[in-house]
Amino acid sequence: MLKFFLPFLLIILFLLTLFIIWRINARKYVTSDTVASAYDAWTQDKLLERLWGEHIHLGFYPTRKKYIDFRKAKVQFVHELVKWSGLDKLPKGSRILDVGCGIGGSSRILAKYYGFNVTGITISPAQVKRARELTPSGLNCNFQVMDALDLKFEDGSFDAIWSVEAGAHMNDKAKFVDEMLRNLRPGGYLALADWNSRDLRAYPPSFLEKLVLKQLLEQWVHPNFISINDFSNILRINKNSAGKVISENWNSYTNPSWYESIIEGIRRPYSILSLGPAAIVKSIREIPTIILMNWSFRKGLMEFGVYKCRG
């Protein structure tokens, strides 16, 4: 009896240990400094880049395609958002601001394939350093450390504003929108993608959903989530907006990214193993949050919103 009970007990203890590590090392949002610290750590330990590549965002999976490489899907996402938002109508040399640029993946595509002059900003000094390292000389990209809630550019400095999965880290969504649209020239383009919750006033979360949302907020430095409709309204009523906002839910295109991000560690085990035991623990530690994200987006508790409007 003992020989059957002991392995079971060891498994329980292992899972309990992982749960304790997961909870103790939660990354709760306190101020924007906690966002900067989290992304500094994620960049410096190299694990996220090894697994996700140069793009720290979800991929785009056309519904008729059975399989697309995880990293290629991320590149595809950038091109799809460019086309959907109308940025491809802008002439070469147009000035683009990439808000929450990460390590510069989107910025480099916008510069290389569309001929744009791109400025990327992120609150993480480590991300700026890495973005500069990854950017070939001669490519029209520059990267700066800057808070998206306090942009240091003159009004109307850019022909387009681009932002992917940054807004969920902003505690003041209206200020986030105001800063972006203030820096957009009249008639310019805004292209934005972000993680949203469903409308929790119209469809209140169950007890289980509340627990899940709490973990999604606390694990990856998110102060709050709002619905696609609420964010669209913030864009619509802003004094610098032309007023017409188009939004869509891209859950069906992006959902495969979640389980693909786990499978990626199996496809490229050396990318984790080469970083040592600490990286293995860190990668395992993220799996529960990814599973909860996958569940939330598939159940409709969370929604992947894309937005476009003009200045």
Language model segments and positions:
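N-terminal auxiliary segments of SAM/dcSAM-dependent transferases
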Residues: 4-49
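Conserved alpha-helix/loop element of class I SAM-dependent methyltransferases that forms part
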Residues: 71-92
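Class I SAM-dependent methyltransferase SAM/SAH-binding core
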Residues: 95-97, 103-150
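A short acidic, Gly/Pro-enriched loop at the edge of an enzyme's catalytic core
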Residues: 149-161
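A short SAM/SAH-binding and catalytic strip from SAM-dependent methyltransferases
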Residues: 160-172
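A short glycine-rich, Lys/Arg-flanked "PGG" loop and its adjoining helix->strand segment in the class I
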Residues: 174-189
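Acidic carboxylate diad motif detector
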Residues: 192-194
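Substrate-binding/catalytic lobe of Class I Rossmann-like enzymes that use SAM or dcSAM, i.e.
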Residues: 204-206, 211-301
